[in-house]
């Protein structure tokens, strides 16, 4: 608009609405969202960044409530335990996670596990858990029968389609992202009896009475022994011993660039997850190299991925063990020495005293020299080719090869 010295200048603006075409990525094709009739949820990289968590799976759960991860409170939020995931409900046949084995690894899997597809290639639950979140462009959850129609029975439990970021044409660009992750134990839901309440409850339930006259005095002595400890002020809150506030960190660095015909990217990632159980930790190193080349009607792309993972399990054992120890037992003697055996006899269900069933201190093994860790190295290469024969008619071919080496080290002291 040219200004020529007018006292009043009236400018009329015209509306110019620009809409972004929304599509549904099924892993096989892209379809306009308004024409797709299936139940679907699309999660963008921006959504993941807002709810960043220990891994991609936890982030998806925080965004979409239909992606349900069953918490195993007995394991104390173990960062090395593969989660039990459901998208379309549970199977009618109750099968334990321990009863099924993965085809490619020793992972414990669930019959309700959805299918994971990344850039057109199937990946395992372990690969999904260790995926570098900064590489993800979008995630699409296919939840209904349309997933079965496309993927067969493998998609009956739902399909999670991951699309990774592709480099943009232009000069070399460097990206870095870092974040902290805090794992804090929440014990507020455990409303446990204190030592006196537990002992009184056992007495009211008849644990210290019997019709066997030969065991009656022994039961009275057992009760008095425990009551003596309670009167001395013993009231142990066992749940506090194996847990901590774990602080982890995550870093990712990528370089990308290229022209319209040839594009490339190189990325490195590191994710450290410190579990709420003392000593539990998961360290994952990721590296990837991608290139894409367009020649007339042909497009070639190759994605090389390398993953190094080290998982350290807690020497404190299962969290559930500490919730089962009576609070009238103390972990240390009067001189501050850790006790191996908390009590050397217990009342059996047969109405007699049994000196064989000892009550062991769950803290004992945690203070002994031990090693319990698992490592794996995986190299995976995905190659894809597209030939656009004519507009709307495209021939696609994909080839994937992977190799994984697993190692497990476990040492328990003879003590």
What does each of the following model-derived ranges do?
Residues 39-63, 71-77, 85-92, 119-127:
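Short, polar/charged loop or turn motifs at beta-strand boundaries
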Residues 1-22, 142, 146, 152-157, ...:
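Periplasmic N-terminal soluble interaction domains immediately after the signal peptide in Gram-negative
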Residues 13-15, 24-29, 71, 87-91, ...:
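Flexible glycine-/small-residue-rich
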Residues 51, 63-86, 93-110, 114, ...:
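Residues embedded in well-ordered regular secondary structure
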Residues 135-138, 155-183, 259-341, 371-406:
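Transmembrane beta-barrel strand/turn architecture of Gram-negative outer membrane proteins
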Residues 60, 67, 139-140, 160-162:
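Non-catalytic regulatory/gating segments with a bias toward low-complexity or hydrophobic composition
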Residues 2-49, 57:
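Short, acidic, small-residue-rich periplasmic hinge/interaction motif at the N-terminus
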Residues 58, 103-109, 113-114, 119-146:
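Short acidic/polar hinge/loop motifs at secondary-structure boundaries
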């Amino acid at each position: 608009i040219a200004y020529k010295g007018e006292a009043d200048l009236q400018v009329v603006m015209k509306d110019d609405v620009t809409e972004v075409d929304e599509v549904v990525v099924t892993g096989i094709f892209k379809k306009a969202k308004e024409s797709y009739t299936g139940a679907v949820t699309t999660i963008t990289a921006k959504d993941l960044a807002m709810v960043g968590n220990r891994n991609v799976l936890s982030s998806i759960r925080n965004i979409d409530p239909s992606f349900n991860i069953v918490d195993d409170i007995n394991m104390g939020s173990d960062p090395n335990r593969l989660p039990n995931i459901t998208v379309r409900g549970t199977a009618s046949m109750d099968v334990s996670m321990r009863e099924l084995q993965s085809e490619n690894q020793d992972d414990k899997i669930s019959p309700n596990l959805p299918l994971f597809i990344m850039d057109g290639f199937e990946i395992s639950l372990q690969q999904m858990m260790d995926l570098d979140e900064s590489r993800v462009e979008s995630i699409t959850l296919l939840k209904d029968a349309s997933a079965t129609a496309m993927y067969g029975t493998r998609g009956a439990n739902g399909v999670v389609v991951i699309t990774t970021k592709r480099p943009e044409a232009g000069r070399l660009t460097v990206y870095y992202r870092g974040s902290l992750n805090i794992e804090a134990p929440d014990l507020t839901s455990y409303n446990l009896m204190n030592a006196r309440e537990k002992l009184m409850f056992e007495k009211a339930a008849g644990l210290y009475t019997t019709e066997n006259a030969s065991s009656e005095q022994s039961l009275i002595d057992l009760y008095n022994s425990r009551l003596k400890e309670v009167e001395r002020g013993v009231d142990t809150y066992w749940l506090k011993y194996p847990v901590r506030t774990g602080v982890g960190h995550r870093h990712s660095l990528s370089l990308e660039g290229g022209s319209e015909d040839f594009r490339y990217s190189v990325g490195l990632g590191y994710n450290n997850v410190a579990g709420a159980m003392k000593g539990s930790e998961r360290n994952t190193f990721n590296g990837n190299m991608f290139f894409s080349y367009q020649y007339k009607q042909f497009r070639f792309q190759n994605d090389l991925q390398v993953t190094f993972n080290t998982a350290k399990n807690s020497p404190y054992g299962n969290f559930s063990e500490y919730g089962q120890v009576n609070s009238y037992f103390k972990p240390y003697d009067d001189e501050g020495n850790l006790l191996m055996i908390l009590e050397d006899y217990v009342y059996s269900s047969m109405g007699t005293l049994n000196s064989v069933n000892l009550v062991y201190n769950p803290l004992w093994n945690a203070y002994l020299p031990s090693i319990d860790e698992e490592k794996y190295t995986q190299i995976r290469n995905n190659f894809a080719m597209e030939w656009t024969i004519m507009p709307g008619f495209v021939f696609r071919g994909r080839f994937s090869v992977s190799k994984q080496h697993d190692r497990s080290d476990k040492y328990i002291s003879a003590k």
